[in-house]
Amino acid sequence: MKALWLVSFWPFGKSKINDFYQNLFVDSIKSLDFDITFSLTQFDEEKVKDFIDKKKINNNYVNIPKTELPSGKKYSNKLMLDNALKQFIDSNEFSYLVYSTADILVPNNLFSTLSKIKLDNFCALIYPNTHVTNGVIKNNYWPHFGIDLIVFKISREKALKFKEMI
């Protein structure tokens, strides 16, 4: 089984804190015992491609110039999802489509836990186990705002229907 991981990175070299947490995120992905390819849709963020190449992460990299976004927008989750679904459908080799932010630590048992779900198709909403605000760990157990990790286990056919809906 393989996973296509939809994520976008902030620019590198502008914030040591952001760089640190994005490095931790990638290292947590690399430590997983699972075949993962990043679906990266970037919007002119600096040094992202260099970072990914240096980290030797399998990836499908697409850059959309900020000039093609609506006025005042920095990114588009819709365009990111469009690109990821196209890659998922075209490759026909992925079992999971994962969305996350790039500032979380991914638990090393993620896919072993997901593999225990015996459904052919499902969506898992996973809350982070560590909440960090401005570089400070706030709490490991308190409920947090936002869903930072979403996992779809879907067939190519379901992905086609999903793409039609968005």
Segments predicted by a language model, with ranges:
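N-proximal low-complexity "stem/linker" segments adjacent to membrane-targeting elements
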Residues: M1-L24
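Short, charged/polar "capping" segments at the starts of alpha-helices
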Residues: K14-K16, D44-F51, V132-N134
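Short, acidic, metal-binding catalytic loop of nucleotide-sugar glycosyltransferases
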Residues: D19-I36
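A short acidic, amphipathic alpha-helical/loop segment
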Residues: S28, D50-F51, N109-L114
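Short internal beta-strands
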Residues: T37-Q42
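Active-site-proximal specificity loops/subdomain of glycosyltransferases
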Residues: F43-S95
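Conserved catalytic core of nucleotide-sugar-dependent glycosyltransferases
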Residues: N77, I104-I166
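Short beta-strand-to-loop acidic/aromatic patch adjacent to the donor-nucleotide binding site
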Residues: F94-P107
